[in-house]
UniProtKB/Swiss-Prot annotation:
The keyword Glycosyltransferase applies. SUPFAM superfamilies: UDP-Glycosyltransferase/glycogen phosphorylase. It comes from Escherichia coli (strain ATCC 8739 / DSM 1576 / NBRC 3972 / NCIMB 8545 / WDCM 00012 / Crooks). This is Lipid-A-disaccharide synthase. Pathway: Glycolipid biosynthesis; lipid IV(A) biosynthesis; lipid IV(A) from (3R)-3-hydroxytetradecanoyl-[acyl-carrier-protein] and UDP-N-acetyl-alpha-D-glucosamine: step 5/6. PANTHER family: LIPID-A-DISACCHARIDE SYNTHASE, LIPID-A-DISACCHARIDE SYNTHASE, MITOCHONDRIAL-RELATED. One of its GO terms (cellular component) is membrane. Transmembrane segments: none annotated. NCBIfam families: lpxB. The keyword Lipid metabolism applies. Belongs to the LpxB family.
């Protein structure tokens, strides 16, 4: 009698965020199926959970058109090799984690060979290049979506999709410890505190830092005790911000932080930030915010024509209304930014109402995503 093959799950993660998701998924699957086998493209966290890495995740982690073009031959070789090897292995399910440009084509190749496929983390098809939804529908048996409006979008096009909640919402408490965060950062409990988050990319920091600093100067006039915290993602962004600050606001006292974005948000009465995942994290930290964003005029002109949503920030997309003030392009200037932040720093009705809505939205997307994803994989594997 031949021994039954263990449940075999193939996975491909292309960057750190995908490695974190993959590790959480593997952990949840191992609790249910201890002898399951995991193979594919994995980062250090997935490998620590027992995933066999046929390729290192860094091979796929390229950004920018020039970088991608330089590595295109290698990327195409890896994809062709994975198509062949997964085709021979015939895993019970293939899970492509984010990295849509690489994974969706791979998923399509595998689906044609009769392998069940899942795409974990929806690309922003609901916002732009909506026709990608048809390619995703052809390539995958199931999309796992973090946010409820993403599922609503796929339902409209009859693409199987499961809303699993957001892992970040699982990781962050419903009621953050503001005083604890202030202890960590050395901020007095009774001071007003503003977080400035000018983005994680060089272009964002270049475009936004001067206006954000000038806004903080204006707010200091109303709140002389204002503590300003500026978390920066790495040494490169910190140097860039320090250079801009030396030109624009050399005398403005601020706390520069290496990372610690989450602590800064929890500790602050209000935040001024670039859009993106930071806005979702800020909402989960229950920190009232204003989104300020600026890009090159042609890029903005193009984005306005391509983007199909009324809002750019995730809190507003989740709420379905302008919960958070968004000041874009010409609107993103110090006087307007300061005027939008003043009522939030006052800690009155406006910020309390925003805090309550943030808590409700947090509960909506706090669904134990790792467990939900594992359940979806096992159901498809049957």
């Amino acid at each position: 009698m031949t021994e039954q093959r263990p449940l075999t799950i193939a996975l491909v993660a292309g960057e750190t965020s995908g490695d974190i998701l993959g590790a959480g998924l593997i952990r949840a699957l191992k609790e249910r199926v201890p002898n399951a086998r995991f193979v594919g493209v994995a980062g250090p966290r997935m490998q620590a959970e027992g995933c066999e890495a046929w390729y290192e995740m860094e091979e796929l982690a390229v950004m920018g058109i020039v970088e991608v073009l330089g590595r295109l031959r290698r990327l195409l070789h890896i994809r062709a090799d994975l198509t062949k090897r997964f085709g021979e292995l015939k895993p019970d399910v293939f899970v492509g984690i984010d990295a849509p440009d690489f994974n969706i084509t791979l998923e399509g190749n595998l689906k044609k060979q009769g392998i069940k496929t899942i795409h974990y983390v929806s690309p922003s098809v609901w916002a732009w290049r909506q026709k990608r939804v048809f390619k995703i529908g052809r390539a995958t048996d199931l999309v796992l979506a973090f946010l409820p409006f993403e599922k609503a979008f796929y339902d409209k096009y009859n693409v199987p999709c499961r809303f699993i909640g957001h892992t970040m919402a699982d990781a962050m408490p419903l009621d953050p410890d503001k005083n604890g965060a202030r202890d960590v950062l050395g901020i007095p409990y009774d001071a007003h505190c503003l977080a400035l988050l000018p983005g994680s990319r060089g272009a964002e920091v270049e475009m936004l830092s001067a206006d954000f600093l000038k806004t903080a100067q204006l707010l200091r006039q109303t709140y002389p005790d204002l503590e300003i915290v500026v978390p920066l993602v790495n040494a490169k962004r910190r140097e860039q911000f320090e250079r801009i600050k030396a030109e624009v606001a050399p005398d403005l006292s601020v706390h520069l932080l290496d990372g610690m974005g989450r602590e800064a948000m929890v500790a602050s009465d209000a935040a001024l930030l670039a859009s993106g995942t930071a806005a979702l994290e800020c909402m989960l930290a229950k920190c009232p915010m204003v989104v300020g964003y600026r890009m090159k005029p042609f890029t903005f002109w193009l984005a306005k024509r391509l983007v199909k949503t009324d809002y750019v920030s995730l809190p507003n997309l989740l709420a379905g209304r302008e919960l958070v003030k968004e000041l874009l392009q010409e609107e993103c200037e110090p006087q307007k930014l300061a005027a939008a932040l003043l009522p939030l720093l006052a800690n009155g009705k406006t910020s309390h109402a925003m805090h309550d809505t943030f808590r409700e939205l947090h509960q909506q997307i706090r669904c134990n995503a790792d467990e939900q994803a594992a359940q979806a994989v096992l159901e498809l594997a049957q």
